């Protein structure tokens, strides 16, 4: 979906964020084999008898670690890379001195994610057009954990993008995953007093920017169904009734496919753009990032993932991810946990 409602063609090289292909990713995704001469799940030699213990501990918390990394980075491909780096460090740890593997692994993952986040921020400064998080196809039961579903939603991830790296890590670890201040202090390399101040500052920052009013999954689903009908039937007034006057449409093509290079602002302009795809688009419901969303298909192929932000019953944000390098996670469900 571009600003002119045209069908896209690939152009330019665009920025590549890594391989988010379906299935497990490198080291952190497969189970190793035990025994003498065994190799760890990265394919590197490890001492006899060691892989099973390390692997079991890692796999027990893998979905949690992925979710931590993803919420800090907004990129599944980069989150998988962080898990790879975490695994390689984990197999070098003396497990006999680790009292709490979960806390230890979360700290390791957070440190690796913060290192990568600083690099990603510089890369995103040169990103072609609006940058949006990489969407995840998630299971319906994610919505049952309301706080988790909100924290991985497209709208919340965009709010988290407005925090500094340390603020983002502290907020995610404290308010989403419920870590103690001492654990967070070790993860981010700051004192507990500093972490408490950062948490207060980050919480206020997020509260001022998060969606206004509690919105249930059912309300979002109903709004999206009305939105789908209006788009597919070309019902302009129906669209205008759903859109807030100051609604913002962001389209992420990453320089790989055509997309609006700047936000499209205002109900009239957004409805006009959406009206141009009525004859060619098929919109299907899906569960994306813990919330109801729509998949836009053209000629039978996935073209765009559409997520929304609702404030007080109206759509205030439309997030259309078109960059094909970000759509590979839509081929299978990704487990997110806390």
Please describe what each predicted stretch is.
Residues 1-9, 19, 36-81, 85-224, ...:
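Active-site-adjacent scaffolding segments
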Residues 245-283:
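A solvent-exposed, acidic/Ser-Thr-rich amphipathic alpha-helical stretch
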Residues 79-83, 240, 271:
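Short, well-structured alpha-helical segments
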Residues 18-35:
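Compositionally biased, low-complexity flexible segments
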Residues 226-233, 242, 273-276:
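Amphipathic alpha-helical regulatory segments at dimerization interfaces
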Residues 234-250:
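Short, well-ordered alpha-helical segments enriched in acidic and aromatic residues
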Residues 267-338:
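Low-complexity, glycine/alanine/valine/leucine- and proline-rich hydrophobic stretches
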